[in-house]
Amino acid sequence: MEIKHDYNVQLFKEKGFIRKQCKECNQYFWTLDPKRETCGDSPCDEYSFIGSSITNKEYTYNEMVKEFLNFFDKNGHTPIKRYPVSARRWRDDILLTIASIAVFQPWVTKGIVKPVANPLVIAQPCIRLNDIDNVGRTGRHMTCFTMGGHHAFNTDEDFKYWTDRTVELCYNFFTNLGIDGSSITFIESWWEGGGNAGPCYEVITHGVELATLVFMQYEKTEQGDYIEMPLKIVDTGYGLERFVWASKGTPTVYEAVFGDIIGKLMDDANINMNDIGPKILAESATLAGLMDIENVGDLRILRQKVAEKLNLDVNELDSILSPIENIYAIADHTRCLAFMLGDGIVPSNVKDGYLARLLVRKTLRYIKNVGLSLSLKDIVAMQLENLKEIYPELMDMKEYIMDVLEEEENKYIQTITKGKGAVERIAKSKDEITLDDLIELYDSKGLPPEVVRDIVEEINKKGSKNNKGNKTIKITVPDNFYTIVAERHEEKKEDSKSEKGENTAEKSTISINLDDIPETELLFYSNPYQKEVEAKILKIIGNVVILDKTVFYPEGGGQKYDIGLIGNKKIISVQKNNNGIVCHTVENTDGLNEEDTIIAKLNWENRLNLMRNHTATHIINAAASKVLGKHIWQTGSNVESNKARLDITHYKRITREEIKEIEKIANQIVLDAIPVKSTVMGRNEAEQKYGFKIYQGGVVPGNILRILDIEGVDVEACGGTHCQNTSEVGYIKILKTERIQDGVERLEYTSGINSVNEVSLMEDILLNASSIVGVPCENLPKTVNRFFEEWKEQKKIIEELHKKIGELEKGNLNDKFEKVGKYDLLVEKVEGAPKELMSIADNLVNEKDNSIVILLNNSGYILCKCGEKVEIKMGELLRKIAKGGGKDKMAQGKCADDIETLKSKVVGEL
C-alpha cells in the first residue's frame, strides 16, 4: 500500500522553495536555489563548510545545547531534563537510549500516558554503537551524540502543530544561527520503525545532514498496510554536535566538540599537526565524508580513494591518519563512557554492561596504539570536567567512574595475559582463525581481535610446535568487527541468570479461559493485615477456585504466593491471569461448589514472613546503594517465607566489611521505626517526583503505579505485600553473597524470627567446633589456624614419603617388565592409594618411553600409563580390560579381576 504525502508546506510556498530531483541519487528535495541540481547530502555533495564557519559565530558544545533549548523554549516548548543513556531504567525492549523519541516510548507514544509537557524540547544524549567502527575514520560518526528534539503529541481534541510549523521552526533555527537559507535543502523521505511510519524531511546544508523531521502518523500492520494513528507525533532529531562542527568548520566533528582534549592527547602522543599539513588533513576529512564502512566494508578500499586524491601511497596515508583516528576515537569513546558509567551502567558480560566493557577495552587498545602516558581514567576525568556545566550529575558519580575504570583496566590486563593459551589451542587444530572464532574469543575470553592477531603473528613467527610444524595460521580482522559484535548484543533478548524468571516486574500468570468472570477484588492492598474473608466461589475449574475477593497474594513481583485455606482445602498455588483474575489452586475441590460462600483464611505466619522479607529487600537495596554507590541497580529478587535474595549490579565482589556495613545500616533503618507508605499515582507524577529509581524492581506497565515509600530510605513501584513500619521487619541478617554473573552480586538474607534462628544455628556450629577442638570460642580462629599450618606440614611430609615409596617400588618393579610385541609391558598389583600408584607409574614410564605400565591396588583401582613412543591410547585400552576411561597417555578406573586375569586380558589386546 503506497501512501502519498504532500511535502509542500506553508514555508516553502511563502519563501519560494522549489521542488527538484537530485541528478545523482534521484531523491526529491526542496531548495531556494534554482541552480541547484543535487540534494546537498553526501555523497552527492562534498562537505563545503570545512575551513570556514557557516554560522554567525563559533559555538562550543555547551553553548549549542543551551542555544537549542532556549530557541524552542522561546517558541512555546517546555524544556525537560534528559533521560539516562541506559534505556533499561524505564523500558525493557532496548538497552541504550538511541533517540530523543525513545524516552517517550512506549507509554506516551501509545497514548497510555500523557507527555510531561506538550509541546516539549529535550537535548538527549544518545548512544548508538552500530557505527562504532566508523568513529574516528569518517570525521562525522560518534558513539555518543546529543539529539535535540522538539516533540508535539497531537490528538483530535488537543492538536498542537504538524508539518507546517515543524518545518518553519527548523528553518528559523538554522537561519537564526546564521546559516544561509539558500544553502538548506529539505529532502523528501519516509521513516519506518517500531511498527510506526510517516513522512519525513532530511535537512541538509553544505553536504552534511543536521536534522531529521519525522511525522509519525501511521501504524504498519503485519500485512504491510498503514493505519492512521489516533496520536500523531512530531518526532524531530537535531544533531547538536554536527551544528557545533558546522559552526567551527574544523576538518572533523571531533576537533569541534573535543578540541581541548584532542590537543592534550596529540601533545601526549607527540603527534605534531604541522607535520601532517592542514591541506592533507582537510582533504582527507572531506573525502572521508563519503566513506561508509557499513556499505563498503573494507577500509583499505576507502583509504585507496583518499590516497589517490591526495597523491599519496596508501601505506603512507595510513601511517599519517591512523594515529590521529585513534586519538579521535579515544576522545569520542571516553565521553560515551562518562555518560554510560555516570548513569550507573556497570561493565559486565551481558546487556548494556557488555557494551560498556566493549567500549572500555577498545579505548584501552587505542591508548596503547598511540603510546599515551595519560590513562583512561585521566581522559574520562577531562570529559567529566567539560560536561559538568550541563550535566553536573555526572560529576557526582566521579568516584565510582574512576574506581570502575581502574577495575576494568586491571581485568583487561589479566585477560590479555591469560588469552594466549586460548588462541594457541584454536591455532593447534585449525589453519584459520575465523570471524566466529574472533567473536567467541571476544565474548568468552574478552580478547580483542587485534590482540588475537598479534598472538597469531607471534605463533607464525615462532613456527610453534603447537601448530603442527611451520604452517601459517590465517587471520583476517574485519574493519567493522566491533559493529558486528555490538549489534549482536544490542539485539539479544535472552534473560540473564539474575533476571530469568525472577524479574521483579514480572507477574506469574495462569492461562484459563475466564472471559465471563469479573476481576478479583484484592483485599491485601487495602489491608495487608486482614487474615481472612468471607468470599463467594465464582468458578471451579479442576482444582482451580475463583473467588469474588481474596486475601491471598498471587505470585508476582519476585514474591512467593500466599498459602492458607479455602474452606478446609489447602492452597498449593495462587496465580493471577492477565485480566486481573486470581486463580487459587487447592489440593482438591471435594465439597466446594460454585456460588458457595466460604471462609478464605491466610496462613498468617507465612504472610508475615513474606511481608518482612519483602520490606527487608527494599531496605537492603537502599543500604547497599549507600555503602557501594549510586550505581547499584536491582536486577532481580526472590522473596520467600524463610529467606529472600536480592541481585544487584556491582563491578567487584562485595567485601566482608561492606556486608557488615550494609547489615548495620539496614538494622538501623529497622530500629528507626520508619512508616512504610503505599500510594497510587500517575506514571509521570511518580517519575518527576522520585526519578527512575522507582523501577529498581523492573519496568512496570501502565499509567497508574503503586508506589511504596520508606521515607528517606527507598521509593519503588512495587505490587508486593509489606509491613507498615520498618520496626515490624525485625532483625535483618545477611547470610551470604555470591557473584552469579560478571557485574551482578546476589545477597541472601533473612528477617525477623528467621534471622534469630539463623544466628542461633551459627552459634551452635561455633560451640560444637569449640567443643571438638577443646578451646573457648574466642580462641577458635587462632587454634584452627595452627591446626591448618600443622596439617600443611604433615601433608608435605606425606608427599615426600609417597615419592620415596614410589622410588623404592620403581626399583622393585623395573625388573618385572616383559616384552610384548614392540612394547615393554608391566602389569602388577601394588599396595597404595591412587596418588601413590600415579607417582610409581610416572617414575617408570619416564625412564622407558616405549613402556606400558598397568597397576592395580587392593581396592580395585586400576591405572594405565604409557611412554611417549607408545601409539596405543590408554583410554581405549582401559575400556577394553576394565571399567573407566582417560586420555591417550593415562587412564584410570575400576577392575574386579585378579592380577593374572588382568594380565591375560592386556596381552590379548596388545
From Swiss-Prot:
Cofactor(s) required, per the database record: Zn(2+)
Organism: Methanococcus aeolicus (strain ATCC BAA-1280 / DSM 17508 / OCM 812 / Nankai-3)
Keywords of the record: Aminoacyl-tRNA synthetase, ATP-binding, Cytoplasm, Ligase, Metal-binding, Nucleotide-binding, Protein biosynthesis, RNA-binding, tRNA-binding, Zinc
Superkingdom in the source lineage: Archaea
Protein name, entry field: Alanine--tRNA ligase
InterPro entries given in the database record: aa-tRNA-synth_II/BPL/LPL, Ala-tRNA-lgiase_IIc, Ala-tRNA-ligase_IIc_anticod-bd, Ala-tRNA-synth_IIc_core, Ala-tRNA-synth_IIc_N, Ala-tRNA_lgiase_arc, Ala-tRNA_ligase, DHHA1_dom
UniProt xrefs under Gene3D superfamilies: 2.40.30.130, 3.10.310.40, 3.30.54.20, 6.10.250.550, Bira Bifunctional Protein, Domain 2 (3.30.930.10), Threonyl-trna Synthetase, Chain A, domain 2 (3.30.980.10)
Family recorded in the similarity comment: Belongs to the class-II aminoacyl-tRNA synthetase family.
Keyword Protein biosynthesis: yes
Record EC number: 6.1.1.7
Cellular component, GO, one term: cytoplasm
Single GO MF descriptor: ATP binding
Region entry Disordered, spans: 488-507
Class of the enzyme per the UniProt entry, highest EC level: ligase
